[in-house]
Each structure stands twice: as structure tokens, then as C-alpha cells.
Amino acid sequence: MENIRSFMSFPESRKVYIEGSRPDVRVPMREIALSPTKTPQGMVENKPVRVYDTTGPYTDPDFEPDVEKGLPPLRRRWIVERGDVEEMERSSVAIQRSLPFVRRPLRAKPGKTVTQMHYAKRGIITPEMEFVAIREQIDPEIVRQEVAAGRAIIPANINHPESEPMIIGRRFHVKINANIGNSAVSSSIEDEVEKLLWAVRWGADTVMDLSTGKHIHETREYIIRNSPVPVGTVPIYQALEKVGGVPEKLTWDVYRETLIEQAEQGVDYMTIHAGVRLHYIPLTANRTTGIVSRGGSIIAQWCLAHHEENFLYTHFEEICEILKQYDVAISLGDGLRPGSIADANDEAQFAELKTLGELTKIAWKHDVQVMIEGPGHIPMHKIRENVEREQEICHGAPFYTLGPLVTDIAPGYDHITSAIGAAIIGAYGTAMLCYVTPKEHLGLPNKEDVRAGVVAYKIAAHAADLAKGHPAAQQRDDALSKARFEFRWNDQFNLSLDPERAREYHDETLPAEAAKTAHFCSMCGPKFCSMNISHELQRKIKEEGMKEKAQQFIRQGSSLYQ
């Protein structure tokens, strides 16, 4: 990972900052420079295009990246100056660690709540809210209102000050999450940090560390300290590792310890499968693919082994009491989501959703931010029902879905089958889309799989933004279309989501530099390019129009005034 800045950069782009009401609220954007348009009257400048930027300081020329030191604590001053947190002498969980990062965890002072929802309900517009308002090109008061109502969340653990605030809610840009993390048989800490950087380079708005192998704590520490975007986890995975991988041995005490450990590290949101209740499990018996959620299957196995109610459900109030001390958002897991088209929208899925609605109200009582996880595998004609039910049953809390995949017949191409569903469900109002890579159902994704998954989901999210009419969503489309029609090939590449791939495909057949201004590509050639023909048609229409105007001028007696 040498020369990280080069690894993260985009062609003809520079980092710019938009300053807020105070000097330390500086919102990053990526500005793409465009070449001028050639006209008969001369060259006409095209304004640069600014786009949402998730790369953090890595693309700032004034920042020297070092994964052993991590990122600067952007939000620490905002957090401390509110006066409601205290620095701990040491972690409250006994763990062995030999890591290069020197930091003391923060938590709320006794009797205090430090969540963005808590501040929003009290009419306070925090620097985090102002930051996301500038990012979204929307009024800060709207941000505050949406967070206060629970319709949006700002995942921002007080122990992850390195993160740049972002918002998840249906009134804002549709966001995407990229899953990374090792497995019991593959990957290393260096691999996962590289995947993190690669994911945010291509536009991931959050990442989830789903590590299930060795060195879970160490891997997560490196990811959090180097992540400019919120980091999510599924705590049950690490809790299971602590009991030797045997679900029956799980206890509330082990899980509670894991929650605190991860909250003190800086995890911004946690998937908690509290909706998998004992009496719902038999509803999955006749499914085609049973329970496909890892967390859901672990909890189901524990419930059946002990014939007891899910301890995450019975201890949910305590979970909220813990997480509100750090501002960890809850992502209510869909442990009974359908894993096949045959199981879509079944009784088990919607039974769990009803419980998630009940738990949402409990979390909001504690001012804990919540989003709701959703499926899964859903055919296109059943997608809308999922959004409508979630919005009604879960009181408008943000919806966060895995795809959904709209068909089961394309292993190796599930980034496509799921991006189709993601675009549709995003247009209906889903707030965040969890990416799927080409390796889904087949193996642990590598760096190139992460790229393919993120880009596929950026396409889906942007398509949904266009459908929703988000402010400024179409600006980039219009700029690229104009560049395409004017045969400004380099601008067309640079405005695309994946400039390298666009340039690579073009240059396979027309690599010469002169081809970057040619009025054709290798698909149609110079004689059959519809856009080149359109240029000729427009020129002729203008000429004919001028001739008609001249004749009209003569008919009117060659007089300017009548």
C-alpha cells in the first residue's frame, strides 16, 4: 500500500472544501476539471463539476497518510466541547493489545446521553448536522428535524472522531455500504485495510467489518483508525469467537462485554438480531433456504438449544443504555430475511419486521439512533411491498437493504442481479444499500470484487437519487452527456464513476491520443456515428433557420423596426 494518495486519486480531480459557520467545519468535495467546448465562435469554458467525496484526507495533498498512525481526529473538538463526555483511564474491557494507536476511549458522563438524536430532539444543530447539510446541499434545520424524528441517522460514535459525518435517510442521497473483513480461512489485517481504502475510493459511504477469523479486535482497530466513513459490525460474530465458536455457549455477559469493547473502539453502528424470537423460528421450517443470515442462524441455534427467548430481545433495554453512552446507532438485523426468491415476503420475514418496529420505539425512548435492515432475495414485483411495510411498521426509520437480488440464477453476477433490485428499492425510499460483489454465495471478495460491487451499487444509488429528484443529482449526468455529444472523450471518462475502466475500454481499439477528440468511437466509426450526424443536422437546421430569417427580413422591407 505504498503511495496511498496515488492509489486513491482520480484523473483531473482535486480536493476542495466548503467551509461552514465555523473554521473547523470543512466539507470535502471532489472537483472535476473539464475542457472547453469548441464552437464556431471560439472556445467556451465549461465549469468544473463538484461531486460527493468519500475518500477522506487521503486525497488531500497536504495530508501524509500512514496506516500505523491513522487519520486525524476531525470531530474530537466538537465532541469534547459539548461538555457531556469523559475520558476513561483505560478500556473497561480487559483485552491484550499491542497496537500502535495511542488513545483513551470516551464515554458519556453519568446521566448524560451523547447521541445525535438526543441533541436534535432538543433543538440543537450540531457541527455534525451542519456538515451533512452542506454535503447534501440541504438546510441544516431539515437535517435536525429528520434526525429528531428518527427518519434519518448520523452514525458517529464519539470514539471514531476520524470519520467525516454522513447521513442515512430517505430525504437524502441514497448511501451504499461495503462489507469487508476476514474469514476463518482467508485474509490479513493489511488486506482488510487495503479493501477499506479501495471501497471508499470507489464511493462506499460506510463499511462493515464482518471479520470472523483471527485477530478480530486488531483488524477492527486498524480499520476504524484509518476510516473516514462510519464503520459497522455484527457483534455476535466476535462474541461467538470468544466462546470457541459454539452458539450454545453464548451468554448475555459475553455479548455485553463485546458491545462495550466495540463501542469503546469506535464502531459507529451495530447490527443486532433482536427480532429473531423463539416462536418465529418454526416459521422457517418449510422454507426453500431456511435461515440465511449468519447472525440470525446463530441466535436461532441458541434459542432452540436452551428453549429460551432470544437474549438480545430480553436485554434490549440494556443494549440501548450501553450504546447511548457512545452514540452507537443500532441497525436492527433481519435475521429471518429470505435467502431465495421462493421465500420472499413470507410469514417469518414479516413477523420479525413487526418486532423490529416495537424495538425501534424502545430505542427511540433512549434517544438511540436506529435503522432497519431488509432483504435479501425479492422478485421485482414484490419489492415495493417491503418498503411500504417497513415505513409503516417501523415508524419511518431508515431502511437498509441487502440488494435485494431479483433472481437466483446468476452466481458470479450477483452484483448485477442485486443492483437491479437496489435501484428499484432505493427509488421507493430505501436509505442505504448494502453492496453485493460478484463473489456473493461463492467466496470471500478480493480487491477487484470490492471495486465491482461498489461501482454497481453507486450506479443503483445514483439512479434512485435521479428517480427521487434529489437536488443536484442530475448535474453530473448532464455534464457527462454534454461531453459525450461534444466528443470531449477525456471529460467523459473523468466524469464517470470508474474513469479507468471507461478509458481502458475506449483505448482497446482506439488508443491514439488523436482518438480522444475524434467524432466517433470504434462501435460506429466515422460514417455511422449518430451524434456526429446530429451535429450536422443541427448545423443545417441553424443554417436553414438563418436563411428563413434573412428572407423574412427582405419580405418586411429590410427594416429592423415595424
From Swiss-Prot:
<dbReference type="InterPro" id="IPR038521">
    <property type="entry name" value="ThiC/Bza_core_dom"/>
</dbReference>
<comment type="function">
    <text>Catalyzes the synthesis of the hydroxymethylpyrimidine phosphate (HMP-P) moiety of thiamine from aminoimidazole ribotide (AIR) in a radical S-adenosyl-L-methionine (SAM)-dependent reaction.</text>
</comment>
<dbReference type="GO" id="GO:0008270">
    <property type="term" value="F:zinc ion binding"/>
</dbReference>
<keyword id="KW-0456">Lyase</keyword>
<feature type="binding site">
    <location>
        <position position="400"/>
    </location>
    <ligand>
        <name>substrate</name>
    </ligand>
</feature>
<feature type="binding site">
    <location>
        <position position="524"/>
    </location>
    <ligand>
        <name>[4Fe-4S] cluster</name>
    </ligand>
</feature>
<dbReference type="InterPro" id="IPR025747">
    <property type="entry name" value="ThiC-associated_dom"/>
</dbReference>
<keyword id="KW-0784">Thiamine biosynthesis</keyword>
<feature type="binding site">
    <location>
        <position position="208"/>
    </location>
    <ligand>
        <name>substrate</name>
    </ligand>
</feature>
<dbReference type="GO" id="GO:0005829">
    <property type="term" value="C:cytosol"/>
</dbReference>
<keyword id="KW-0479">Metal-binding</keyword>
<feature type="binding site">
    <location>
        <position position="179"/>
    </location>
    <ligand>
        <name>substrate</name>
    </ligand>
</feature>
<dbReference type="Pfam" id="PF13667">
    <property type="entry name" value="ThiC-associated"/>
</dbReference>
<feature type="binding site">
    <location>
        <position position="273"/>
    </location>
    <ligand>
        <name>substrate</name>
    </ligand>
</feature>
<protein>
    <recommendedName>
        <fullName>Phosphomethylpyrimidine synthase</fullName>
        <ecNumber>4.1.99.17</ecNumber>
    </recommendedName>
</protein>
<feature type="binding site">
    <location>
        <begin position="334"/>
        <end position="337"/>
    </location>
    <ligand>
        <name>substrate</name>
    </ligand>
</feature>
<keyword id="KW-0411">Iron-sulfur</keyword>
<comment type="pathway">
    <text>Cofactor biosynthesis; thiamine diphosphate biosynthesis.</text>
</comment>
<keyword id="KW-0004">4Fe-4S</keyword>
<dbReference type="GO" id="GO:0009228">
    <property type="term" value="P:thiamine biosynthetic process"/>
</dbReference>
<dbReference type="GO" id="GO:0016830">
    <property type="term" value="F:carbon-carbon lyase activity"/>
</dbReference>
<comment type="similarity">
    <text>Belongs to the ThiC family.</text>
</comment>
<feature type="binding site">
    <location>
        <position position="237"/>
    </location>
    <ligand>
        <name>substrate</name>
    </ligand>
</feature>
<keyword id="KW-0862">Zinc</keyword>
<dbReference type="Pfam" id="PF01964">
    <property type="entry name" value="ThiC_Rad_SAM"/>
</dbReference>
<dbReference type="GO" id="GO:0009229">
    <property type="term" value="P:thiamine diphosphate biosynthetic process"/>
</dbReference>
<feature type="binding site">
    <location>
        <begin position="293"/>
        <end position="295"/>
    </location>
    <ligand>
        <name>substrate</name>
    </ligand>
</feature>
<feature type="binding site">
    <location>
        <position position="377"/>
    </location>
    <ligand>
        <name>Zn(2+)</name>
    </ligand>
</feature>
<feature type="binding site">
    <location>
        <position position="373"/>
    </location>
    <ligand>
        <name>substrate</name>
    </ligand>
</feature>
<keyword id="KW-0408">Iron</keyword>
<feature type="binding site">
    <location>
        <position position="441"/>
    </location>
    <ligand>
        <name>Zn(2+)</name>
    </ligand>
</feature>
<feature type="binding site">
    <location>
        <position position="529"/>
    </location>
    <ligand>
        <name>[4Fe-4S] cluster</name>
    </ligand>
</feature>
<dbReference type="InterPro" id="IPR037509">
    <property type="entry name" value="ThiC"/>
</dbReference>
<feature type="binding site">
    <location>
        <position position="521"/>
    </location>
    <ligand>
        <name>[4Fe-4S] cluster</name>
    </ligand>
</feature>
<dbReference type="GO" id="GO:0051539">
    <property type="term" value="F:4 iron, 4 sulfur cluster binding"/>
</dbReference>
<keyword id="KW-0949">S-adenosyl-L-methionine</keyword>
<dbReference type="InterPro" id="IPR002817">
    <property type="entry name" value="ThiC/BzaA/B"/>
</dbReference>
